Amino acid sequence: MAESSGSPHRLLYKQVGSPPWKETFRQGCLERMRNSRHKLLNRYRQAAGSTLGTASDRLLVQEVMEEEWNSLQSVENCPEALLQLELPLNLAVLQDIEQELWNEEKSIISEYEKGLQFDESCLNSMLAEWEANPLICPVCIKYNLRIMNSVVTCPCGLHIPSHSTDLTEQKLRACLEGNVNEHSAHCPHIPEFSVTGGTEEKPSLLMSCLACDTWAVIL
């Protein structure tokens, strides 16, 4: 079906900009793509890391370009000279910008994938450290934990009375490793550990992950 002459997509290809207009449009599109990082990565995760080039990827690039075009056409942002332009658009103008947006998208996803690989490497190192050495404090990841009279302590200041009277280093190690492995089964990011609780309640050891918005009480 023929596209309406007044549609945003046709408008995008109808009017032309001089080189200064092209640069303004290019910079605006790149900024929008960078600000759409969260949206892009959500789509990438939902596609389970499929190869770039799908219809949804192309839709995001087009969406970014049309949003920036509409922004430039607004009364506040659009130069008067641009509003008066009626020359046919040189398609190479948009093709160049579209390719640059594709490159930016690939760069964002490449950076994300490298981060996942780094997180996986750190997670494996942390688990190996727990298995090979005295139990490392998951909060400071520097000193060894000590368990005495059912109280877990660390030189970093961690001090947590346990509800279990028979808590041992082996049991705490198994609990930590079990929770970390359970989390890594559905999220590639490294969880963080912290101590919660104030003066009127017993402190607890909490494992949380901002990436998948989950948490668990370890101790």
From Swiss-Prot:
Purpose: Mediates the import of RPA complex into the nucleus, possibly via some interaction with importin beta. Sumoylation mediates the localization of RPA complex into the PML body of the nucleus, thereby participating in RPA function in DNA metabolism.
GO cellular component, one term: nucleus
Lineage summary: Eukaryota, Metazoa, Chordata, Craniata, Vertebrata
Record field: transmembrane: none
Subcellular locations according to the entry: Nucleus
Alphabetical GO biological process terms: protein import into nucleus
InterPro entries in the record: RIP, RPA_interact_C_dom, RPA_interact_central, RPA_interact_N_dom
Gene Ontology terms, MF aspect: zinc ion binding
Subunit: Interacts with the RPA1 subunit of RPA complex.
Keyword Transferase: no
Name used for this protein in its record: RPA-interacting protein
UniProt-annotated stretches for the region Mediates nuclear export: 164-180
Coiled coil: none
A Pfam entry, by short name: RPA_interact_M
Modifications after synthesis and translation: Sumoylated; required for localization in the nuclear PML body and transport of RPA complex in PML body. Upon UV irradiation and during S phase, it is desumoylated, releasing RPA complex that is translocated to sites of DNA damage. Sumoylation takes place at different Lys residues.
Keywords per UniProt: Metal-binding, Nucleus, Phosphoprotein, Ubl conjugation, Zinc, Zinc-finger
Disulfide links within the chain: none
Modified residues (Phosphoserine): 18
Gene for this chain: Rpain
Positions of RIP-type zinc fingers: 137-212
Main location: nucleus
